[in-house]
Each structure stands twice: as C-alpha cells, then as structure tokens.
Amino acid sequence: NYLYSERHHIELKERLKCVLHRTLRKDVSEYIKYTNREAMTVAFNPTPAEEELYREVSAYIQDVSKIAVTTRYRTLIVLMIRKLMSSSTAAVKGTLEKLMERLCRIEKLGGNTGDLIVFDEDLLEEYQDSLSDFDDRCRNAYAKNYPTDADLKAEKEFLQSLIDKAGKIEVDGKTEKLVGAINRGFEKIREKGGLRKVIIFTESNRTLNYLFDYLSAHGFKDKIITFNGQNNSPLCNRIYNDFVENHSAELTGSRANDMKKALVAAFREEAEIMIATEAAAEGLNLQFCSLLVNYDLPWNPQRIEQRIGRIHRYKQKCDVVIINFINKQNLADVRLYDILQY
C-alpha cells in the first residue's frame, strides 16, 4: 500500500518539500512570544446511580438480539452511544428516548426495520463525517428478521425502565464539581491578568443544553452563550439579530459566518461563559479568553489540541489555563490523560 510504505513516504516527502513547508510553533518562538499553558485536572467519580445506569445501558447495546440498535453498523452506533454515556446522563436519556421512538416505529410498520437507524441530531459531531459515508446505505438497509410482538413489548418495557432510571438522576457527579472548577480557574486567570471568561467544550448538544440550565441556576444566569453546529436557539437568534442591527458594516451576507461573528462578539463583550461543541474547535479566534474546560475529553488527542488552539494562539496576552475533567473509573479517560502528560 502506497500510504504505508516507508520507501514511498520518503519519496513523497522529497516531492513535496519544494512546495510544502511545515512550521511548528516552537520554530517561531524566537520571533513570536507565545504565552505559557497551565493544565489542571478535575478527577471525579460517577454516583452509584450513574454506575448502575452505565452498566445496564452497556449490556443493552451490546446484546445483538436487541431490536432498537440496528444490526448494520452496530459497532459505530454502539461507539457513539458509549461516548454519549461518558458525556452526561442527559445525553444518555435523550438517546434512549430516540431508541424508544425507533421501537414504536418498528411496531407501527409491522416489523420492517429497513430504513430505521438511530439518526439523532445529538450524535457526536466528531462522527458526522463517518455517518454521512454510509447514510444512504443505512436508510436502504433491509432487515430480514422481523421481531415478534412479544419481543417488542419486552424490549420497550426494559428500555422504559432505563429511561426512568436516567430521569431520576438530576445532577451528574462531574457536574457537581463544575462550578468549583470554573471559580478556581477564574481565580487562576485573575492572577495572570486574564479576563473573567471561560469556554467549556462538550461533545453532546444535549449536554450543552443541560450545562446551560445548570450553570444558569448556579450563579451564571444571563452570563452564558452557546455555540454548536446549528446555532438556532432563541438566544443565538437574538444575539444574531442584535449584531445585524448594530454591525451592518461587518456583515458578509452569509448567515453562518455572521452568526459566528455575532456569537464571538457577544462572548468578547458581554458573556462570561461560552458552552460549545466540536463545532467551535476550529475557525474561532478567542485570544481574549484564557480559560478552557474540557468537560468531555475526545478520544483523539489532536482534537483536544484543536480546542486549546482557540485560546492559546497568536495575540493571546496572558498565560492560559486548561481544566480537564477525568473520570477515574473510565479506562479510556485515564489512558488519554496519561497520553496528554507527554
């Protein structure tokens, strides 16, 4: 294979070096003075109720006899659900409700599951490209094994029990540590001369909304804006309309670009907190902010670096502080944390 041959790698580098030059940050440090970066870790343990829910949902999605999780592309769907489980109970509950909707549709259509796969706007944005590659094929997939009425009834009852358990968990274990972590971060950046601003990254839109409500009720009401792939909330639309009215000379004619400008301006001039999904990990210049919270850790370390690059960049005047939430009982989180130490 050309891509994995060492000889071809060397040949390709020789062919490209006359037109392609890679400059690392360390290569220009003599000319451009980048600020320092300080990392903080917030370790947390899920509550017993969260642990029980995680075990039961894990067993459910791994059971190949279950109807709601499609047989085709099961591995990818299970992967995404696992990531949502590590994000928040709110994300888990919403996903379980989507699975229940799927069972009800299967029941209504008499067992034909051909065009029914769990497509949900809350699927992790980092997997959207992978999903689009087989979207059409999934929608045209045909399941030959029709579930019985008894199977559907039993699975719906079990799924409802999981939804009920999720609904009883009002605040997650790691959420209880969020306000304290933000305030410690604010104190750190105050000492470094930074502004009282923080961007919080999550991988789930439902977690974004859950955190917005939680922080609004715990001292940050009217101090928060959100940024995701849609930016169609009433708050985003209000900010956009205000920006259009007061900054007409800066408009580009593209609603998506102007919305991005409006949200960045609102964060810079008014808000203390921006809660964002991976949609904000590229293309935003937030050098006026020097505090970042990784509420969810992507499994790809490069994505973490892309997030940090929103604030730790050229024209950043202060040292930056990065707060990483680590689930000490999640082996993937622990391993990723170990990787980030090097």
What is each PLM-predicted segment?
Residues N1-D115, A332-Y342:
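Inter-lobe coupling linker of SF2 helicases/translocases
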Residues Y34-P46, K93-E270:
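Conserved Helicase C-terminal RecA-like lobe
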Residues T47-E51, L84-M85, A91-V92, L99, ...:
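Conserved nucleotide-binding/hydrolysis micro-motifs of P-loop NTPases
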Residues H218-D222, W299, Y314-C318:
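Secondary-structure transition/capping motifs at alpha-helix termini
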Residues V264, I275-C289, G309-R313:
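SF2 helicase motor core recognition
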Residues N285-D296, V321-N324:
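A short beta-strand element within the Helicase C-terminal
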Residues Q302-I308, R313-Y342:
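A conserved SF2-helicase RecA2
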